[in-house]
């Protein structure tokens, strides 16, 4: 009965399928093309594993190494790459066409904080009842927000109407 090997694992020792493999020694020197059994025997003599590093090459390339250490280093690299990823969130600020000056200033302060933290910001103007007739007021609020944040943000997406809302996206300016 043949066990299927998960995709993310590498073939080692008896799992290597090719009859002949190009072997790289433990200290990086080329040992040449050997039969699979000779390569495995050589690795076992050194107390190490024969690990397939390039399966698509002809013949496949195998390296003599400690498989446990190899897996550990792969996990460390993966963790380091994951740690260095930055997740950009989209924060949303909601305003109304009749938002007063103090409330407007508070909303702009929040937008500035989100942008400075590196997040994108969606600014939404909500219209209630008959306010929808005055879309120009909503557009003027969005234009004013763009003007007040132009030193740290750029408009990522133009103002767009959707149902009873008008929204736009702001993104941080690229760092110099």
Swiss-Prot record:
The gene is infC. IF-3 binds to the 30S ribosomal subunit and shifts the equilibrium between 70S ribosomes and their 50S and 30S subunits in favor of the free subunits, thus enhancing the availability of 30S subunits on which protein synthesis initiation begins. It comes from Nitratidesulfovibrio vulgaris (strain DSM 19637 / Miyazaki F) (Desulfovibrio vulgaris). InterPro entries: T_IF-3_C_sf (IPR036788), T_IF-3_N_sf (IPR036787), Translation_initiation_fac3_CS (IPR019813), Translation_initiation_fac_3 (IPR001288), Translation_initiation_fac_3_C (IPR019815), Translation_initiation_fac_3_N (IPR019814). The keyword Protein biosynthesis applies. NCBIfam families: infC. Belongs to the IF-3 family. Monomer. It is found in: Cytoplasm. GO terms for molecular function: ribosome binding; translation initiation factor activity. Gene3D superfamilies: Translation initiation factor 3 (IF-3), C-terminal domain, Translation initiation factor 3 (IF-3), N-terminal domain. GO terms for cellular component: cytosol; membrane. Keywords: Cytoplasm, Initiation factor, Protein biosynthesis. This is Translation initiation factor IF-3. GO terms for biological process: ribosome disassembly.
């Amino acid at each position: 009965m043949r066990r299927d090997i998960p995709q993310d694992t590498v073939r080692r020792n008896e799992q290597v399928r090719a009859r002949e493999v190009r072997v790289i020694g433990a200290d990086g020197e080329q040992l040449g093309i050997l039969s699979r059994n000779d390569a495995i025997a050589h690795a076992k003599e050194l107390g190490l594993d024969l690990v397939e590093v390039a399966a698509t090459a002809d013949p496949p390339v195998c390296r003599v190494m400690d498989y446990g250490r190899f897996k550990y280093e792969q996990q460390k690299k993966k963790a380091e790459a994951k740690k260095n990823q930055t997740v950009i969130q989209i924060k949303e600020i909601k305003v109304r066409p009749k938002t007063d000056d103090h409330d407007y200033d508070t909303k702009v302060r929040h937008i500035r904080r989100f942008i400075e933290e590196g997040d994108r910001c969606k600014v939404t103007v909500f219209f209630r009842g008959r306010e929808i007739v005055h879309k120009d007021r909503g557009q003027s609020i969005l234009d004013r927000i763009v003007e007040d944040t132009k030193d740290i943000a750029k408009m990522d997406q133009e103002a767009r109407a959707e149902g009873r809302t008008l929204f736009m996206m702001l993104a941080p300016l690229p760092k110099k």
